[in-house]
């Protein structure tokens, strides 16, 4: 009985900090993915991936890595001017988005285990500095697929 009172107090104190908070500016990042696709690759060993990570939360986050059983490695790339370079991470701003698009930031699937074809999906897991991982099934589109922009 002597141990129950301190344990109950400790549990109550822990739960005090677990409020849900209705203010969207007060919380962590709230991440989702849209417009994901992989153009059917020409190469047997590499493919590019595109998607948009949307953050509706009040805190920024950072995409730190991407994993997939479809490839030996998946790396993050950004295009600066006319050159492409690998980066360790990319920011996902609060109340903003990180867009991976042709000619800009993109995922590079290297050492493909097999070449994905149009109509299939490739599962990836996005890893972030603060948020938990997001699993995404990315459809494989034709090599000349152009996403709708809403214009």
Across the structure, where does each feature detected by a protein language model lie?
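Short, conserved catalytic or interaction motifs in soluble domains
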Residues: 20
């Amino acid at each position: 009985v002597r141990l129950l009172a301190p344990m109950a107090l400790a549990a109550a104190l822990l739960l005090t900090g677990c409020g849900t908070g209705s203010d969207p500016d007060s919380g962590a990042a709230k991440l989702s993915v849209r417009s994901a696709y992989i153009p059917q690759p020409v190469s047997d060993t590499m493919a590019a991936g595109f998607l948009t990570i949307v953050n509706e939360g009040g805190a920024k986050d950072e995409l730190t890595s991407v994993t997939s059983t479809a490839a030996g490695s998946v790396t993050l790339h950004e295009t600066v001017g006319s050159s492409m370079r690998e980066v360790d991470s990319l920011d996902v701003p609060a109340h903003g988005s990180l867009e991976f698009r042709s000619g800009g930031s993109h995922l590079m699937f290297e050492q493909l285990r097999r070449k994905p074809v149009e109509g299939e999906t490739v599962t990836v897991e996005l890893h972030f500095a603060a948020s938990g991982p997001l699993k995404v099934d990315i459809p494989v589109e034709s090599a000349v697929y152009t996403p709708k922009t809403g214009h």
